[in-house]
């Protein structure tokens, strides 16, 4: 059920973002919904962690998501001021997205591995 809700929220946020202006409130809400729906999609793995661990993981996820969002908005403003080809800007932003998401996933994997419960119910 959480996978269905996560996928529905993901597509809904993409549709709202595509039809809203960049700095509008609906665009910001849709961006937040995007990250929340990704978290809901991965909620099936929550039984492997204690409540305190889930709080740490969720806070880390939202901080990293906010950091990636701010990094992308900063880079788009920076690239708009530089007079270079649109294709180069597009490739640089795609590279920035892939790199920052890969780093965020590595950080989340490291934190999740450290906080996972042992078979006896205690955390590592």
From Swiss-Prot:
Offer one Pfam family short name for this entry: YoqO
What membrane topology is annotated for this entry? Multi-pass membrane protein
* Major subcellular location class: membrane
A GO CC annotation given for this chain = plasma membrane
Does this entry carry the keyword Transmembrane helix?
Answer: yes
Locate the transmembrane regions by residue number.
54-74, 88-108
* Subcellular location per the Swiss-Prot or TrEMBL entry: Cell membrane
Q: Which UniProt keywords apply?
A: Cell membrane, Membrane, Transmembrane, Transmembrane helix
Q: Does the keyword Transmembrane apply?
A: yes
Q: What is this protein called?
A: SPbeta prophage-derived uncharacterized protein YoqO
Q: Which organism is it from?
A: Bacillus subtilis (strain 168)
Lineage, please? Answer: Bacteria, Bacillati, Bacillota, Bacilli, Bacillales
């Amino acid at each position: 059920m959480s996978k269905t809700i996560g996928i529905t929220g993901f597509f809904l946020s993409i549709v709202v973002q595509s039809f809203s202006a960049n700095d509008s409130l609906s665009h910001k809400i849709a961006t937040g919904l995007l990250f929340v729906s990704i978290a809901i999609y991965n909620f099936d793995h929550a039984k492997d962690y204690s409540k305190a661990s889930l709080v740490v993981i969720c806070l880390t996820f939202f901080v990293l998501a906010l950091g990636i969002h701010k990094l992308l908005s900063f880079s788009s403003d920076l690239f708009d001021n530089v007079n270079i080809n649109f294709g180069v800007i597009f490739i640089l932003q795609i590279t920035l997205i892939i790199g920052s998401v890969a780093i965020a996933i590595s950080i989340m994997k490291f934190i999740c591995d450290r906080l996972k419960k042992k078979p006896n119910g205690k955390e590592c």
